[in-house]
């Protein structure tokens, strides 16, 4: 349940299969608040049999969990999520820089902008 390399996840999954074990890669989104409140989003990769076995654990930790594909797919999904988050953060930074350059108080702009409030 960590964010790591999709290649490493596939290697761990293959080794688990050799040993007769089940394995998933299952990175999460939601941070420490999501973990504390059992509201994590869990992005899993691996066999459906392993996913079904892990669902009671996921239900105790999260609000949403999806099997994304084979081993490594959870890691790839987490990376895609991080790209989306980073681009939103960059957009907010650009908007505030623009506001400042236009002579506005950048602390006031998010209060009047629904898009900035959602992203912040």
Protein language model features and the residues they cover:
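Helical "substrate-binding/catalytic lid" subdomain
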Residues: 73-120
């Amino acid at each position: 349940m960590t964010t790591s390399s999709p290649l490493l996840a596939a290697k761990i999954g293959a080794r688990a299969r050799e040993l007769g074990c089940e394995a998933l890669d299952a990175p999460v989104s939601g941070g420490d608040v999501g973990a504390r409140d059992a509201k994590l989003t869990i992005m899993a990769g691996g066999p459906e049999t392993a996913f079904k076995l892990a669902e009671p654990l996921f239900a105790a930790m999260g609000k949403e969990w999806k099997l994304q594909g084979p081993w490594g797919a959870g890691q790839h999904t987490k990376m895609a999520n991080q790209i989306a988050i980073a681009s939103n953060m960059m957009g907010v930074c650009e908007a505030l820089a623009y506001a400042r350059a236009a002579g506005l108080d950048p602390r006031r702009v998010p209060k009047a902008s629904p898009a900035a409030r959602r992203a912040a």
